[in-house]
């Protein structure tokens, strides 16, 4: 029997994958939107097992996310390698300072990466780079069509890039508007040169249920491009909302050192109805070339949960520990913040063995950088626990755990203060789902549970069984008291809340608009995935 692996290769909120190979090593990056650090970079030797090297943008000077709205920030990146240098090109959307398309470079994929080279006169999103064998470099991206006739009418455009000056030169040209008649949201372009032909692969249909991957080719880089008559080369839009994998699209291709071809792409796994709290995830699917065109998932034409393993030597990496005791000098790379931190709101040194969060006025509902340290929900079933030492000094102060979809859709499970500490479980959402991905609709707070509690050391537990989330509190280890069980988690899914991101769970502290000198100390945080493979 051939070996198989389990999709997705990166579970949880890891959308818009881009991949490149250097020798026997593979590198992959994903979009991160309003989260900091930005753009995780992963390394693999077998395309199945991945380890995170760090982030492309890990310094505040590189990434001004100040004021970025929910699902703004860093959109789809592309990673490429050329003559000893790695390049990542990306788009920063929204915010109150810099925005637009930019390039960063490194000679080591683990970093450090350069400060951004911002590109002028480069409208649109989803930029990609192509290095031709004649030494010329090209920028390819998407933008609203110059003769826009309908909503979602975009075009793929090309312009030469001067690598020495990091600027676009020459005249831009339009390559394609997509395969479908009146195609919508032609985006995510990538160029490849194979056997003397230029291939332009894009996504269209929008990054939801109608998502698809299409391809065209030309003998000249500037076109004209002829579409594959068998487009789309991969989509699940015809399989219904109850299919186990939906929204397939936004792909990139890689050839192994042994001549096999593989595609990475995003997709979603709905559960509890057409809801996907884990967000858009990274999947891997084989392809082969027939009559000059790629055939994706030969024999089925579908992205599968179980797929044959690439013909590469297996290379596993040490597993990420389930429990973080905060005994190192830096946070593990799976931890993230909301937007760019402009002051030191967290510390691993103030109290060794603890993660200290300063209480600040910023709240989850603000388009700011609250005192939040979180990680992705990566499983439909999971258990998360944490130990917190905290003495609230005023009624406005709180600390605990939160489940975050965005600033208007989240669940706060916190200790609040004054003379008598209280456990508060608060859901922020809207009564009905958001009918569109953007913009995010303002929500309101609803208190789900409230009970007094004594002490200054608290144990939190959150369990998810599909869309049912349960919350427990204790003042002694394992002496759990139910706060609320079976809470509806669908508000944490983009089909309900809107936007482009997946659910985070993490640690949070706030003085809710008031000044404070207080802090909250987290002794440890544990996350256990309970999905059956």
Segments (PLM) and residue ranges:
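Carbohydrate-active catalytic/glycan-binding domains of CAZyme proteins
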Residues: 1-533
């Amino acid at each position: 029997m051939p070996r198989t692996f389990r999709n997705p290769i990166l579970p949880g909120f890891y959308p818009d994958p881009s991949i490149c190979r250097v020798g026997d090593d593979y590198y992959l990056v994903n979009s991160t939107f309003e989260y900091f650090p930005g753009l995780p970079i992963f390394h693999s030797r077998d395309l199945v097992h991945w380890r995170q090297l760090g982030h492309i943008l890990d310094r505040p000077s590189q990434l001004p996310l100040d004021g970025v709205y929910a699902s703004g920030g860093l959109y789809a990146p592309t990673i490429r390698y050329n003559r000893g240098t790695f390049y990542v090109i990306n788009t920063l959307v929204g915010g109150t300072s810099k925005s637009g398309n930019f390039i960063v470079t490194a000679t080591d994929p683990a970093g450090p990466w350069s400060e951004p080279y911002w590109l002028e006169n480069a409208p649109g999103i989803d930029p990609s780079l192509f290095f031709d064998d004649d030494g010329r470099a090209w920028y390819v991206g998407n933008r609203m069509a110059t003769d826009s006739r309908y909503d979602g009418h975009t075009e793929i455009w090309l312009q030469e890039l001067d690598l020495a000056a990091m600027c676009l030169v020459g005249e831009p040209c339009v390559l394609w508007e997509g395969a479908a008649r009146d195609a919508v949201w032609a985006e995510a372009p990538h160029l490849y040169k194979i056997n003397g032909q230029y291939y332009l692969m894009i996504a269209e249909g929008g990054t939801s249920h109608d998502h698809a991957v299409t391809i065209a080719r030309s003998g000249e880089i500037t076109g004209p491009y002829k579409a594959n008559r068998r487009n789309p080369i991969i989509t699940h839009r015809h399989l219904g909302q109850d299919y186990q994998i939906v929204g397939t699209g936004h792909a990139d291709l890689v050839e192994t050192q042994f001549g096999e071809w593989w595609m990475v792409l995003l997709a979603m796994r709905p559960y509890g109805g057409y809801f996907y709290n884990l967000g858009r995830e990274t999947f891997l699917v084989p392809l082969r070339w027939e009559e000059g065109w790629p055939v994706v998932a030969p024999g089925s034409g579908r992205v599968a949960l179980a797929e044959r393993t690439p013909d590469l030597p297996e290379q596993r990496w040490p597993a990420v520990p389930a429990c973080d005791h905060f005994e190192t000098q830096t946070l593990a790379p799976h931890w993230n913040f909301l937007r760019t931190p402009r002051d030191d709101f967290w510390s691993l040194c103030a109290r060794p063995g603890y993660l200290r969060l300063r209480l600040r006025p910023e709240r989850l509902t603000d388009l700011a950088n609250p005192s939040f340290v979180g990680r992705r929900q990566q499983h439909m079933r999971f258990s998360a626990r944490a130990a917190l030492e905290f003495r609230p000094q005023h009624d406005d102060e709180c600390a605990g755990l939160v489940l975050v979809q965005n600033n208007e859709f989240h669940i706060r499970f916190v200790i609040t203060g004054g003379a008598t500490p209280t456990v508060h479980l608060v859901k922020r959402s809207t009564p009905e789902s958001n009918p569109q991905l953007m913009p995010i609709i303002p929500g309101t707070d609803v208190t789900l549970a409230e009970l007094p509690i004594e002490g200054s050391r608290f144990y939190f537990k959150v369990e998810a069984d599909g869309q049912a989330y349960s919350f427990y509190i204790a003042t002694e280890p394992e002496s759990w008291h139910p706060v609320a069980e079976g809470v509806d988690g669908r508000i944490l899914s983009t089909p309900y809340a809107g936007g482009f991101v997946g659910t985070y769970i993490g640690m949070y502290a706030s003085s809710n608009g008031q000044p404070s000198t207080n802090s909250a100390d987290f002794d440890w945080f544990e996350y256990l995935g309970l999905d059956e493979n």
